Curated annotation (Swiss-Prot):
Binding-site residues for substrate, renumbered to this chain: Y270, Y339
Organism: Picrophilus torridus (strain ATCC 700027 / DSM 9790 / JCM 10055 / NBRC 100828 / KAW 2/3)
Gene3D superfamilies cross-referenced by the UniProt entry: 3.30.70.2510, 3.30.70.3190
The name this protein goes by in its record: tRNA pseudouridine synthase Pus10
EC number of the protein: 5.4.99.25
Gene behind this protein: pus10
Keywords, alphabetical: Isomerase, RNA-binding, tRNA processing
Length: 377
């Protein structure tokens, strides 16, 4: 190593020591730089070493300033752990890489050191531990000397039962009216002070379909919550007071739970009220669907916002519960993702076969309920 070339870079001791962070472990970069300077001085004599330099611009001496900016933005956010990230001028990053390559590329980046050292500083001042899965992430912009915060969302798992034919699962962008998402989310916002909320459902039912039986799994996400720990039973009581939506089995969860409920596919049991010119032949038509594979092209009613694909779905059975006055009550068990209304009406030939085509007369679903989702509870 050419010590003269090294100190001719005119870096501060911290930035000098960081060039060799992987060589002499057990020391801080500043201590490592001081040792290198001692070696230089013993050969070449005294020289001025800048306290700050063009590489770090004194950023490691600005922790108190960054802390004050952070405190002005915390606004009573509740958190138990922290993580620090940072951004530096790309020119600084490239300059550092170039310098380190000249001396064997055995150092660490300024970002890595800053995140570590400012993280230790914050952990001590805030009394909160460091975590890779932190409640609060602090992002420092070293170039513009600013601090931003990212609050980890709160995820709450539950199961809902919907006893209404007038509410959608999620909010519509350009429409008003209640939804499962808004009924739960507005109460969640009131209790957590979150900026927004998002419902993640394990599948969905149409607006006019009731979700009964053992209910549908969901996760409600509170974005940028001020309060992380709330009484989940109180949330349940508030939502259930609506009289049309009932939630239960609430527990804190995570993004992994969202992925799980989104990926799992479960057979479902439906009760459908069907109208048409009904006679005794409907029983024979229903029997044709025992363990039958049908083909469904994306229904016309949803074609504007879903891909036009043909999907093969298994129908386990269609059983008749009762027939009276031109109405039949059917019990239908089918694979996840089956369009039940189209299974009955045929959707102008886009579902083949349909109950209407097998029966030989047009049938329509006048009401539909999901009464069971076959999952491992």
């Amino acid at each position: 190593m050419d010590l003269k070339e090294l100190f001719d870079l005119n870096l501060c001791l911290r930035c000098t020591g960081r060039i060799f962070a992987a060589v002499d472990t057990g020391l801080t970069n500043e201590e490592r730089g001081a040792r290198l300077y001692f070696a230089y001085k013993s050969i070449y004599g005294e020289r001025d070493v800048p306290e700050s330099c063009y590489l770090c611009n004194g950023v490691f001496k600005k922790f108190d300033e960054f802390f004050n900016i952070l405190m002005s933005k915390l606004n009573n956010y509740e958190f138990n752990s922290i993580l620090v990230g940072s951004t530096f001028d790309e020119n600084i990053i490239e300059m550092e890489k170039d310098i380190q390559s000249r001396f064997g590329s055995k150092g660490e980046s300024i970002k890595k050191e800053f995140n570590r050292e400012f993280g230790k500083y914050l952990s001590k001042r805030l009394g909160k531990p460091f975590s890779k899965d932190a409640d609060l992430t602090i992002e420092v912009d070293a170039l513009y000397e600013n601090v931003n915060i990212i609050v980890k969302p709160v995820y709450i798992y539950g199961v809902y039962i919907k006893k209404s034919r007038d509410i959608s699962q999620t909010r519509w962008i350009h429409k008003t009216g209640e939804s499962i998402e808004s009924i739960i989310g507005n109460e969640l916002r009131s209790m957590t002070g979150c900026e927004n909320y998002y419902l993640h459902g394990s599948g969905r039912e149409d607006v006019d379909v009731m979700m009964l039986g053992n209910g549908r799994e969901f996760v409600i996400e509170a974005a940028m919550p001020k309060r992380r720990y709330i009484d989940l039973y109180e949330l349940q009581l508030r939502v259930n007071a609506s009289g049309i939506l009932f939630i239960y089995n609430l527990s804190y969860s995570s993004k992994a739970t969202v992925r799980r409920i989104k990926s799992e596919l479960h057979e479902k049991l439906y009760i459908a009220e069907v109208t048409g010119d009904l006679n005794k032949d409907i029983k024979k038509a229903c029997s044709k669907f025992n363990n039958l594979i049908i083909e469904q092209r994306t229904p016309l009613r949803v074609i504007n916002h879903r891909s036009d694909l043909v999907r093969r779905k298994k129908i386990n059975y269609i059983n008749i519960i009762s027939i009276m006055n031109g109405r039949a009550l059917l019990k239908i068990c089918a694979e996840a993702g089956t369009y039940i209304k189209e299974l009955v009406n045929g959707d102008n030939g886009r579902t083949v076969p349909s109950l209407s085509s097998v029966y030989g007369s047009q049938l329509q679903v006048s009401s539909l309920d999901v009464v069971k989702i076959y999952r491992d509870d």
